[in-house]
Amino acid sequence: MRHEYSNLKIFAQGGDAIKAAEILRGEIESRTGAMPQMTDSGKADISLIADPNGLRDGYKIEQSGSRLVFRARGIRGLIFAIGMFLRKIEVSGEKITLIQDIGGEYKPDKRIRGHQLGYRTTPNSYDAWDLEDYRRYYLDLMFFGCNTVEHIPYDGLGAQQNRLMKYDPQDFLVEASRIADEYDLDVSLWYPNDRESLEDAEKRRRRVFERTPRINVMFPPGGDPGDYDADEFISRCRDFSRL
């Protein structure tokens, strides 16, 4: 069934829900030119609820006609719910049409759903991005259910500041991680095992880890670069896991 909205009204309960509501309001304004108003729960078309007993990596949508309630433990699940809504609407001027019912409980099949987007000179485009471009990309990924972004620490990988790549890569990583943390978006670091002493490798990693606000995963590729035998590779990974 299709449901139409004009002058969309939103209610939010809980700190993360208020943050998520601001994201939803911004997305609607960018599509319609009209900023939805905040209201109380009895008048809201969409209510966002931060529920301590809700899903962290999923969400519930309760639907009664055109009225919707998005429910999740925190901002991550609420952003996922917003993404579902945005993917199922059509916009014409200021009119929004939900093209199908979307009520239900949504849980991911895969625990890790990530994308690598390290700030460096080797990509074709996003070395020219700034932090707000990354914020935009993070949200776009989360609207489709992504829960992890993977960055690449700068360890002499050839990244140099220039007229396109304006920021220090390591400083950029720190701030990009901070933005990810605002959205409860997991951060993975792609960190290869190069030919260097364990002591030097630990020092380099410790410097990065101490500066970076959020790190959930360190991913050490088995090669390209790195050519350790399996036993030594695993041993070094275990040492790094204790940092």
Question: PLM features: what roles do these ranges have?
Answer:
Residues D109-L243:
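Aromatic-lined carbohydrate-binding surfaces of glycoside hydrolases
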Residues M1-K110:
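Contiguous, structured surface segment used for ligand recognition
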